[in-house]
């Protein structure tokens, strides 16, 4: 096994692939069907040729390993990913867990179904993991990309969540029907600034959808658009939660406080970045925008 692992690492290292050691072990696990125990015991890789061929393909294309595999791990599940969807990141688990916490709080007072809205669902990983872990919730997931919605639908079917998650093509709130409101709204919107986008790792910049990454107005474009309209769609006492990039949480908090919400949580990731902001709707909605931004 060590021989194969070293060969894979050399192929990746020679091609300038970042984190070659980590990716080599992923290849042995996912392509070579090697468990952690197998690796510790240095068991023989039975399909060495297939493993090396995958490593060479990764080296030649420079593509994200998840695209070549066709899936990404997220919260213990494998989600189909394509060039039309963002690859789920570990940090996004914080957003899911925050939403689950708010659902549980609301459930203590509300016996009915908890209605959840996921704006910009992409692969559907957030919507699916909320639906899987909150049996009292029903999720409406929106995305402007038809291709992303198709992938999200396939993920819901694969996880047997098709009855709990509804998908709808929508530019932010545009496809919502009159009177539709929600107890919890979540979004991991595009938030990369133009100057930062140009400096992204090429596996992100060249292979993941630009429309799901890049935001104008110093990365604040979609936070402003969503928060400006959110008061019409979040029930009184309900919550809205966002994932944020480094340095954005403070401005997101200010926008929320100016538009009928009271910030309840600012959650740091393992790097100490303020990654998730959550806020509670504290104004009774009259179906109008609260304040201009």
PLM features: what roles do these ranges have?
Residues 94-199:
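Conserved SAM/SAH cofactor-binding pocket of Class I
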Residues 1-47, 51:
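A short N-terminal interaction module
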Residues 29-102:
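Conserved AdoMet
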Residues 217-280:
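Conserved Class I SAM-dependent methyltransferase catalytic core
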Residues 191-222:
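Mobile active-site "lid"/loop adjacent to the S-adenosyl-L-methionine
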Residues 277-284, 293:
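C-terminal lobe and adjacent flexible extensions of AdoMet/dcAdoMet transferase-like proteins
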Residues 27, 62, 92, 126, ...:
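Residue-level signal for inorganic ion chemistry
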Residues 16-17, 134-136, 157-162, 233, ...:
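Short helix-capping segments at alpha-helix termini
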């Amino acid at each position: 096994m060590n021989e194969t692992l070293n060969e894979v690492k050399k192929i990746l290292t020679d091609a300038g692939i970042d984190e070659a050691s980590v990716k080599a072990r992923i290849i042995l696990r996912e392509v070579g069907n090697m468990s952690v125990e197998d690796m510790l015991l240095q068991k023989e890789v039975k399909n060495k040729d297939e493993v090396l061929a995958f490593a060479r393909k990764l080296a030649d294309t420079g593509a994200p390993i998840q695209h070549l595999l066709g899936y990404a791990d997220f919260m213990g599940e494998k989600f189909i990913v394509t060039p039309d969807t963002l690859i789920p990141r570990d940090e996004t688990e914080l957003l899911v867990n925050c939403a689950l916490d708010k659902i549980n709080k609301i459930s203590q007072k509300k016996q009915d179904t908890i209605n959840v809205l996921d704006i910009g669902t992409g692969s559907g990983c957030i919507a699916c993991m909320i639906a899987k872990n909150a049996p009292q919730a029903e999720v409406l997931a929106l995305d402007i990309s038809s291709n992303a919605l198709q992938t999200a639908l396939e993920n819901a079917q694969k996880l047997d969540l098709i009855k709990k998650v509804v998908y709808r093509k929508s530019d932010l709130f545009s496809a919502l029907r009159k009177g539709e409101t929600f107890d919890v709204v979540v979004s991991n919107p595009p938030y990369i600034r133009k100057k930062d986008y140009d400096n992204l790792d090429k596996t992100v910049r060249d292979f993941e959808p630009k429309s799901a990454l890049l935001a104008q107005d110093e990365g604040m474009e979609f936070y402003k658009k969503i928060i400006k309209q959110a008061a019409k769609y979040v029930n009184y006492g309900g919550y809205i939660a966002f994932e944020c990039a480094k340095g954005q949480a403070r401005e997101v908090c200010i926008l929320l406080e100016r538009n009928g919400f009271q910030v309840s949580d600012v959650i740091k990731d393992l790097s100490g970045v303020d990654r998730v902001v959550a806020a509670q709707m504290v104004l009774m909605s009259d179906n109008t925008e609260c304040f201009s931004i």
